[in-house]
Amino acid sequence: MKKLFLLFFIALTFTIVKAQTYYYNATSFAYKVVNSYGYWTNWTDWESCNVPIVMDYNNDVVTIYSNKTQIYKITKYIRKFTDSSGGSQIEFNFIDQDYDRGVMRLRIERNGNSQIYVDFTNIMWVYNVRRSR
């Protein structure tokens, strides 16, 4: 009986740990920058892409496998909220592989579409994403 309980506990632990990693695939992206007058530009048109994204909450790391791999270490979970369009968002602070700080948001619209926003002080980009696993 003890062995059965131990096996069940190990299986449950593995399931819980595994559930903390989410896999996405970005299908398009857009960006905007701060112009020379200090104002944000409009978002660019969407550009197609095929970029895997892994959100590993066990290790507090988000990795975006674009042409240049982007690694974001989550430093603080800010909040989870419903935005004015009815979508739900999770927002957190991060430090990237170049030690720059920013804010990342995972947004899930009411219709199920999802985006990942990466915001710095002078540039921000957004990926349209789908869960891949």
Language model regions located:
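Bacterial Sec-dependent N-terminal signal peptides
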Residues: 1-23
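Tryptophan-anchored aromatic micro-motifs
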Residues: 20-44
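Hydrophobic/aromatic beta-strand elements that line small-molecule binding cavities or substrate pockets
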Residues: 50-55, 76-79, 103-108, 129
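A short, compositionally biased
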Residues: 56-60, 86-89, 110-113
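Contiguous, well-ordered beta-strand patches that form the walls/edges
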Residues: 61-103
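Edge beta-strand at a domain terminus
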Residues: 68-81, 119-133
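Short, exposed beta-strand-loop hairpins at the edges of beta-sheets
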Residues: 103-128
